[in-house]
């Protein structure tokens, strides 16, 4: 029994020496004592290849490469102890979830923390750490007693409570495992216990290579190997000079030196002979003097400079994608020009979550075979999502999001349907569920679902059309596709008495859906498209899910469990599932994490993402215990994993390992921005490299090739997939700025695409975008007639929409596009309710021959309650009755109608104007409808403007009859003559024109009428600020002022006094007008003369004719208006359709100049002056 160390700096040949010794021994004695070659898990494959890679050794039974866990498996198979069921990470998380749920009431700190994402991953890691460091539940309990007895501060009590929770959960976990199960950490403890009984290990020659430190558990294994084996050889990366001086925690080799001393101490304790250490001083790894210099002087202070040609290259990239593309281009160059194999190249990185997806995509585009040494989670696979969402449907009472997450996995679809058709139908079905607010009991009820198009509150027609009946049948058919398998599982889960029966319900759910056949179809499709990685995913995921169910049954099969806990435990297990890595092929670029990689025999290393906070790593205090808490436990004798401070001290060694892997070339790169465009800083490590290598190449990488030389641009010509975007970039430059002499070879590349049989069709769409202009071509007369008909019939809002943006008008009224209907209460719905409520009250007053002025406060409250109760069942598929939240909203709306009724009562008492009618239709046909506003357009097309007027008021005096328009609005609004001029606010003046033009035939007395004005009434329930001692009357007066109607009124003092009979001088509280003492109007009054009203009405006619002419002539320009801070695009539903983009030459706003009312009026006069 002896111990031997082989030490040396990185690249000194430690592994090579050991491998050569083993190979020579196998060559001399193929059938001797066992040779164990122990390496970290991630080194096993490459070490196995290296061991049998020589000409003399093509295979071996005597020598085997193991990790500690694989050695444990081997020994336990020999001596026994492997019969207990293994539970993987997913099983551990599921068991912990169950333990926490059952212990929840007794936990001090983790009761609420258990609901946070990642809690069970952290808890599992903490327990694994306890085991690796030989900390038992009783050790943790003793620690809690000690902490509890001496806790005085809040921080000490928190730690004591945390340790108490941990010992409870750890003890429960161990009790659940004992005699039945083994987790990954238990194998190593069993290995320690069983090594003395192993004949396979007894007398073995043991090599331990590639480790820098050992956990206490691993150190015990080393102890037993020294006792049982003939000789143990351990390699450590240490400079011999370090051993000759006192150890310092700032030394580069501090960690490995401590490991060296610990192992020697173990050997002394066991009286193991310690052979003379073999120091290796040469640097056989490095074929480059620069890399040899970097290794030899890495830790030197000040930095030792290398003045020769550096085989180190630094790349600074504009962004992460440009960085990865730069790496891909250089890899292709090395393979094409310097005869590298892909296996000679490795890419090292730390923040893989930011890079892996981009690297998979780009390396595939560049045809670079690659292997990412990182397991991917299964959580996004359709099968995992199907199970998780189906369980959420049942436990969460059939919520919309869970249902359609399950639907979108497409595993609920019948096996024999065409997926494309089913997707379209399910999209329609989802629209229905959104529009009708389908959830909860409606899914499980046997009552068929009804389909009716919602039109308006006035639509009381109960007849169903053929198209509605057809849609209703389709919806009920699709409902059954979705709900039937889930309801079957729901019933089984409710009947289930044990976890085993619940797992069986999940299994039967999958079997009845033909999931194995569907996954097989997905696998075949992936193979046919050449995506072999995803093809194997579909095989793995089924096996892992079945294994998870088996584990669940094995661990908890006979226990009873609530449905919610079963769902939580199952979800925890599913989240832990990971895809196993496919072993790398013989010729692939290896992409690995800096902290976990153990590379060898690579000629070129690319270290990417070298940004501040990443390399070296910024301190991160994460996990169950903080650094301070770990220090407290350490002081009390419980050794755990290194703290953040210790990890930071080890970071220099990690970086040293990182830059000493390659034999010939080292590339270091960093992006200056992430995928979202956020600025990133280069690491201080790059500055260090620049100081060591003054001649280092520092290249800036960008995806914009315009500023590069011709030779540099040629490197961007890679695969056809990648190069196409650069061709486009260059041709766009040529198009904008002309030929600059640097583009000639890009024309050759362009010619390849347009002449290649394979790429001609593939590239045509991309290349055609070179001449793309986001401009809507004018419709032909024939198309325009097909869309709009021979007679245009539209509302004033439609005409205003055309003037806001002709393309939006085309999308809405030509193509009939609309947003999908969602079961929610929007502003238009509330506006509709307000209008209907006030009309119902007014109609009741008319039937009773009363006016608003006759109402008492109590009657206002009663009527507002009555009408809201009448309307609520009719609005938006009974949305106000659908939930407690909407019921509360209904009460708030009733209060607004109540307040509005009180104000209308006050207005009626102060006004000579009385309502003639509400919701007055014109051009709508039927009884009581006024005629439309009609126009004959120059091209012969007839146009009718139709609509519905909120309220028409009338007043009479000795000067005649006056009519005014009141428009109810749920937000504050006034009449802006600038917007009238631009055709954006035509509604009120149109209404006034309609009623005054038809007054003689419409009103009972048959008199002509003059315009009195147009006013907006803001329906709301305002909050007012008053002094603390304000009386009720003063408060009501302030509220009344908040309802002052804005708009434009006739500049006649008598008419204004008819609107507010309390007005003598000063400003009116009812309308936007005021009188001076001399009887003239104040400057702030919004008034117009009768002649000006006539001009405005003529201008409205003029504007409608122009709009009609443009519509019928096919004008659909993408030309939204912009006026100040208002723009047509702000609330437009069609932005995704028109793709308006200000950066494009053709896409610019029509900027409308703001004007004073007097200026606008003058321009309006000029427009209609000739009419």
Swiss-Prot record:
Protein name, entry field: ATP-dependent helicase/deoxyribonuclease subunit B
Domain UvrD-like helicase C-terminal: 281-587
Cofactor note: Binds 1 [4Fe-4S] cluster.
Chain positions recorded as [4Fe-4S] cluster binding sites: 805, 1129, 1132, 1138
Source organism of this protein record: Bacillus thuringiensis (strain Al Hakam)
Subunit structure: Heterodimer of AddA and AddB.
Enzyme class: hydrolase
Gene3D superfamilies, alphabetized: 3.90.320.10, 6.10.140.1030, P-loop containing nucleotide triphosphate hydrolases (3.40.50.300)
Highest taxon of the lineage: Bacteria
């Amino acid at each position: 029994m002896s111990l031997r160390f082989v030490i040396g700096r990185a690249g000194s040949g430690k592994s090579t020496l050991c491998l050569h010794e083993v190979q020579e021994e196998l060559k001399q004695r193929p059938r001797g004592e066992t040779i164990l070659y122990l390496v970290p898990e991630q080194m096993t494959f490459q070490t196995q290849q290296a061991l049998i890679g020589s000409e003399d050794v093509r295979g071996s039974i005597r020598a085997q490469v193991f990790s500690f866990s694989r050695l444990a498996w081997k020994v336990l198979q020999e001596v026994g102890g492997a019969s207990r069921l293994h539970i993987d990470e997913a099983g551990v998380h599921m068991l912990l979830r169950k333990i926490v749920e059952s212990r929840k009431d007794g936990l001090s700190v983790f009761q609420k923390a258990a609901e946070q994402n990642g809690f069970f991953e952290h808890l599992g890691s903490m327990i694994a750490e306890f085991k690796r460091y030989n900390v038992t539940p009783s050790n943790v309990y003793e620690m809690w007693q000690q902490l509890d007895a001496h806790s005085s501060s809040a921080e000490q009590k928190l730690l004591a409570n945390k340790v108490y929770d941990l010992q409870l959960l750890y003890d429960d976990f161990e009790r659940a495992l004992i005699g039945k199960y083994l987790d990954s950490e238990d194998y190593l403890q069993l290995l320690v216990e069983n090594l003395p009984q192993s004949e396979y290990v007894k007398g073995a020659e043991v090599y331990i290579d590639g480790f820098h430190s050992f956990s206490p558990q691993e150190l015990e294994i080393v102890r037993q190997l020294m006792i049982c084996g003939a000789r143990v050889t351990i390699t450590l990366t240490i400079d011999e000079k370090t051993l000759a001086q006192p150890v310092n925690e700032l030394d580069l080799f501090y960690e490995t030196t401590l490991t060296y001393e610990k192992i020697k101490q173990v050997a002394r304790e066991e009286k193991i002979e310690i052979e003379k250490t073999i120091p290796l001083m040469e640097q056989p790894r490095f074929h480059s003097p620069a890399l040899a210099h970097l290794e030899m002087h890495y830790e030197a202070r000040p930095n030792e400079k290398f003045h020769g040609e550096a085989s180190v290259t630094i790349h600074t990239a504009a962004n992460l994608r440009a960085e990865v593309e730069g790496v891909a281009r250089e890899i292709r160059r090395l393979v094409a020009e310097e005869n590298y194999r892909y296996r000679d190249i490795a890419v090292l990185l730390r923040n893989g979550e930011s890079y892996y997806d981009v690297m998979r995509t780009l390396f595939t585009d560049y045809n670079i075979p690659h292997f990412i040494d990182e397991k991917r989670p299964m959580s996004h696979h359709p099968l995992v999502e199907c199970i998780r969402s189906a369980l959420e449907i049942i436990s969460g009472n059939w919520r919309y999001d869970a249902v359609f997450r399950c639907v979108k996995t497409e595993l609920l679809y019948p096996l024999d349907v065409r997926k494309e058709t089913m997707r379209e139908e399910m999209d329609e079905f989802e629209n229905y569920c959104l529009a009708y607010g389908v959830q909860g009991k409606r899914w499980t009820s046997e009552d068929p679902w009804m389909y009716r198009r919602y039109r308006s509150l006035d639509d009381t027609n109960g007849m169903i059309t053929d198209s509605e009946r057809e849609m209703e049948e389709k919806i009920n058919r699709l409902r059954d596709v979705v709900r039937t398998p889930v309801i079957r599982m729901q019933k089984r889960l409710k009947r289930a008495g044990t976890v085993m029966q619940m797992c069986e319900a999940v299994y039967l759910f999958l079997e009845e859906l033909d999931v194995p056949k569907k996954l097989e179809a997905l696998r075949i499709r992936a193979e046919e498209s050449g995506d072999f990685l995803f093809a194997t995913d579909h095989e793995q995921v089924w096996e892992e899910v079945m294994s998870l169910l088996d584990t669940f049954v094995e661990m908890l099969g006979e226990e009873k469990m609530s449905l919610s806990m079963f769902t939580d435990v199952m979800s925890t297990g599913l989240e832990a599932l990971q895809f196993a890595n496919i072993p790398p092929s013989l010729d692939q670029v290896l992409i690995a994490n800096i902290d976990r990689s153990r590379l060898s025999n690579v000629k070129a290393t690319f270290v990417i993402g070298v940004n501040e906070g990443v390399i070296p790593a910024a301190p991160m205090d994460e996990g169950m215990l903080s650094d301070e808490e770990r220090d407290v436990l350490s002081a009390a004798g419980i050794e755990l994993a290194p703290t953040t401070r210790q990890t930071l001290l080890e970071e220099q060694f990690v970086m040293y390992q990182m830059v000493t892997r390659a034999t010939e070339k080292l590339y270091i790169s960093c992006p200056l921005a992430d995928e979202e465009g956020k600025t990133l800083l280069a690491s201080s490590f790059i500055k260090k490299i620049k100081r060591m290598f003054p001649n280092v190449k520092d290249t800036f990488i960008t995806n914009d090739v315009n500023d590069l030389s011709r030779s540099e641009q040629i490197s961007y010509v890679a695969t056809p997939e990648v190069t196409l975007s650069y061709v486009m970039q260059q041709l766009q430059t040529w198009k904008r700025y002309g030929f600059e002499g640097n583009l000639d070879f890009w024309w050759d590349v362009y010619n390849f695409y347009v002449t290649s049989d394979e790429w001609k069709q593939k590239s045509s769409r991309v290349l055609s975008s070179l001449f793309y202009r986001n401009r809507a071509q004018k419709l032909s007369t024939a198309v325009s007639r097909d869309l709009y008909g021979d007679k245009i019939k539209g509302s004033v809002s439609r005409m205003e929409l055309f003037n806001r943006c002709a393309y939006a008008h085309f999308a809405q009224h030509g193509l009939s596009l609309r947003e999908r209907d969602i079961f929610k209460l929007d502003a238009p719905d509330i506006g509709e309710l307000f209008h209907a409520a006030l009309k119902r009250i007014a109609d009741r007053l008319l039937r009773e021959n009363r006016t608003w002025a006759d109402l008492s406060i109590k009657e206002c409250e009663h009527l507002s309650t009555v009408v809201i109760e009448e309307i609520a069942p009719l609005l938006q598929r009974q949305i106000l009755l659908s939930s407690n939240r909407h019921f509360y909203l209904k009460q708030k709306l009733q209060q607004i109608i109540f307040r509005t009724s009180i104000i209308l009562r006050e207005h009626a008492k102060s006004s000579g104007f009385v309502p003639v009618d509400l919701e007055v239709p014109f051009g709508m046909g039927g009884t009581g409808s006024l005629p439309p506003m009609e126009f004959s357009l120059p091209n012969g097309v007839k146009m009718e403007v139709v609509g519905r007027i909120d309220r028409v008021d009338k007043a009479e005096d000795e000067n005649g009859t006056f009519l005014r328009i009141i428009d109810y609005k749920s937000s504050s609004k006034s009449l802006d003559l600038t917007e009238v001029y631009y055709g954006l606010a035509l509604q009120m003046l149109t209404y006034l024109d309609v009623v005054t033009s038809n007054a003689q035939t419409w009103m009972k007395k048959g008199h002509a009428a003059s315009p009195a004005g147009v006013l907006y009434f803001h329906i709301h329930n305002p909050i007012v600020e008053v002094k603390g001692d304000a009386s009720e009357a003063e408060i009501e007066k302030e509220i009344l002022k908040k309802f002052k109607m804005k708009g434009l009124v006739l500049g006649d003092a008598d008419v204004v006094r008819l609107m507010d009979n309390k007005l003598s001088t000063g400003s009116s509280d009812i309308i936007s007008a005021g009188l001076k003492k001399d009887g003239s109007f104040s400057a702030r009054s919004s008034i117009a003369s009768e002649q000006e009203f006539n001009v405005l009405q003529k201008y409205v006619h003029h504007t409608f004719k122009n709009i009609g002419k443009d519509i019928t002539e096919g004008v659909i320009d993408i030309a939204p208006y912009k006026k100040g801070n208002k723009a047509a695009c702000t609330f437009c539903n069609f932005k995704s359709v028109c793709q308006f983009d200000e950066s494009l030459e053709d896409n610019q706003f029509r900027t409308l100049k703001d004007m004073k009312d007097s200026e606008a009026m003058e321009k309006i006069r000029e427009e209609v002056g000739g009419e």
